[in-house]
Amino acid sequence: MRRTIQTALLSLDWLIEKGVRIQADARWQENSAKPCDTGSSVDDLKAEFAKVDFSAVDPVYPDKTSPRGAKYAFTKEAILERARSGVQDIREHKEKLILVVSHSGFLRLGVTGHWFFNGDYRVFELDECNEPDQPPKLKQLEATLSGGLGKSWPDPVVIGSDLPIPDAPPRGKRHSQDTTSFTSDNRLF
């Protein structure tokens, strides 16, 4: 979370000066449980970043490995669920524009299916979904197909690909009943 807060404070300072608040949210953290992808304690972050609102951060953060932290585990199911939850939460906000500063791996494999170069951005609109309990589809603006800086790979990946499935057979040995939770139009479900 520290890296994303630093990025937000540096790149969005002009909005912060106008009173836009920064809201920390544990759902948008990076995927793995490696030290480089596991956050610092909220108390440490509060002391370092007084301008950030941490009131909604899940108290279990930064735990990703205990039973309490299972919803943040480095598994396909956990990552896709927090992506769905995060996108659904955005849909429920009253603001017309929400900026998410997150991590490339999580955004690519859990949320958008698109690559992000360091410091790059993409712009998406939420298309309403008429199916109950389904999050909206993400529709990327054509101007950011290679990232807003033009440095990101334009070729999408399948959401959820390369994410670990506990107790799954090794790649190439999956049975036909093993399926994934995505559609070709990158709708999260």
Which residues does each PLM region occupy?
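Phosphate-coordination/substrate-recognition cap region in phosphate-metabolizing enzymes
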Residues: 1-55, 114
